[in-house]
Amino acid sequence: MIELWPAIDLIGSTSVRLTEGKYDSEEKMSRSAEESIAYYSQFECVNRIHIVDLIGAKAQHAREFDYIKSLRRLTTKDIEVGGGIRTKSQIMDYFAAGINYCIVGTKGIQDTDWLKEMAHTFPGRIYFSVDAYGEDIKVNGWEEDTELNLFSFVKQLSDIPLGGIIYTHIAKDGKMSGPNFELTGQLVKATTIPVIASGGIRHQQDIQRLASLNVHAAIIGKAAHQASFWEGLK
């Protein structure tokens, strides 16, 4: 069964969503982060909660550590955190604060040796986040090009004990227009590492289709704030 990971994106300790990762598209969510955690925690089908420090991702260092630490105390669900994680000490601080998993993106792309070291140091607890327009990988809060190809890069990671690869199709993110099923399916076939789909998920039918592609988990953003998404789920 595909896992469900609702998302909380933070700017200034406020729960927001962006469209296509553009910071000028910031939209405040109807529920606070605290309210969202309480809401998601009632569902047995929620395996973990995905939290992103958006300003940290852009500024290249974590900004919301203390606030995220306070959120950790509000639920028994697993929590993973990403955004601005660039050092081993940051990862260790999050783990010491009770965070279960850390997400590495830009730093892992720019320094694959470091990514390998972190994955071997914390096997199964480091997730690699790859964000792309089509097959073109972006970094630093999705604002910079890398000239790297999604599939070529991911194939380099096959022997690393990562928890998974979080794939965000940027053009779909925040639009509620459905995931990029074609590229997501191709990515699943290109690696033995579990693939987590993010971006564009609208409803349970999207989840079912991702499950048919052998996607390990789905990160749900805007849709998770709609009661209709959760109808019939426990």
From Swiss-Prot:
Active site positions, chain numbering: 9, 131
E.C. designation(s): 5.3.1.16
Localisation per UniProt entry: Cytoplasm
Top-level class of the enzyme under EC nomenclature: isomerase
InterPro entries assigned to the protein according to its UniProt record, in alphabetical order: Aldolase_TIM, His_biosynth, HisA_bact_arch, Isoase_HisA-like, Isoase_HisA-like_bact, RibuloseP-bd_barrel
UniProt keywords, alphabetically: Amino-acid biosynthesis, Cytoplasm, Histidine biosynthesis, Isomerase
Keyword Cytoplasm in annotation: yes
HAMAP family according to UniProt: HisA
Family membership noted in the UniProt record: Belongs to the HisA/HisF family.
Protein name per Swiss-Prot or TrEMBL: 1-(5-phosphoribosyl)-5-[(5-phosphoribosylamino)methylideneamino] imidazole-4-carboxamide isomerase
Organism of this sequence: Staphylococcus aureus (strain bovine RF122 / ET3-1)
Designated gene of the protein: hisA
